[in-house]
Design a protein with these regions (language model features):
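Residues forming the flavin
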Residues: 1-245, 251, 255-264, 268-302
Length: 303
């Protein structure tokens, strides 16, 4: 996004990297396979990095204690770099992005099971080789399954479509063998760059467990301290804490705060995030305009 913004004529005051320190040994282990299987993606990434470099955008590593400052609106951002030096930078916009996390809420709402990926620090839906979830007939592809880029999403969607065609009797696996082989091969190629991406952008889990005064649920104005106190009441499970604090009940329906809440509860009770899971979510999964709701003409559409 930074490279695209620069190409469009925008200006960037700085890029703050909050992820875990990069293991260059791991980079050297994953880079050859990524170059061999996905040279186009690697080249595209290098071009974008070059764009950022030649536009003289300052990049800070191992950043901590990011604070948005201003009176009524954002005026500046303060942070501490890897040397412990505190910086104050004037800015009108602050964009925050932590990790590469699939959108699991639709699967979760449908009753599908999730699994915790310790390497990528996120929950993912449990799927078979075709993308079918633990709910029979519910297929998941693209960024709802795992973040792998546009090419991976395309081929995972194609595999799901082929499996559906077989399930409804439109074709058998033998007749579709060539297409199945093609899309599986292309999907594996596209995903071969993922270990490198994970190594370079690994989420620091403590970033999701900040100080008490940090806002976790912006929709309902719930900070980390409120969640920690609620965690000590009752079972301390995500659904109960959601009910106690209204975390995840706002417009975003937990898309921003569900994982941080589970991480906070895990650290408070010294339990694993995988054991706690995420709180239940309700539709709509994204803000719905009144006009969009009114345009539903049939009762079946509304259901």
């Amino acid at each position: 996004y930074a490279a695209q913004l620069l190409t469009a004529g925008g200006s960037i005051a700085g890029i703050l990297q909050t992820g875990a320190p990069v293991s260059w040994v791991r980079v050297l282990q994953t880079l050859p396979e990524a170059i061999w299987q996905c040279p186009g993606q690697i080249a595209k990434g290098l071009v974008r990095l070059a764009k950022i470099h030649f536009c003289h955008v300052r990049t800070f590593r191992d950043v901590k204690k990011i604070e948005a400052r201003g009176s009524g609106k954002l005026e500046a951002v303060s942070f501490t770099d890897h040397k412990g030096i505190t910086h104050h930078v004037d800015a009108a916009v602050l964009m925050v992005h932590e990790g590469l996390i699939p959108g699991v809420h639709p699967v979760l709402a449908a009753g599908g099971r999730l699994e915790w990926d310790e390497t990528e620090m996120c929950f993912r839906p449990i799927l078979d080789e075709w993308g079918e979830s633990t709910v029979p007939g519910l297929f998941v592809a693209g960024d709802a399954a795992r973040i792998g880029g546009a090419d991976a999403a395309l081929h995972s969607g194609a595999l799901a479509a082929l499996r559906i065609a077989m399930q409804i009797g439109h074709a058998d696996e033998k007749a579709l063998a060539t297409k199945i082989h093609f899309h599986r091969k292309k999907f594996r190629q596209a995903m071969s760059v993922r270990p490198l991406v994970t190594t370079l952008s690994r989420l620091r889990l403590e970033q999701l467990s900040p100080a008490d005064d940090v806002m976790i649920c912006r929709c309902e104005s719930v900070n980390a301290g409120t969640i920690r106190r609620a965690a000590l009441t009752g079972s301390g499970m995500p659904d109960q804490v959601k009910a106690f604090t209204r975390t995840g009940m706002g417009a975003c329906q937990g898309r921003q705060c569900s994982l941080p809440l589970s991480v906070l509860l895990a650290s408070t009770h010294n339990r694993s995030v995988a054991e706690l899971g995420l709180f239940r979510v309700r539709a709509p999964f994204k803000p719905l305009k009144l006009g969009e709701l009114a345009s539903l003409s049939h009762e079946s559409d509304i259901q």
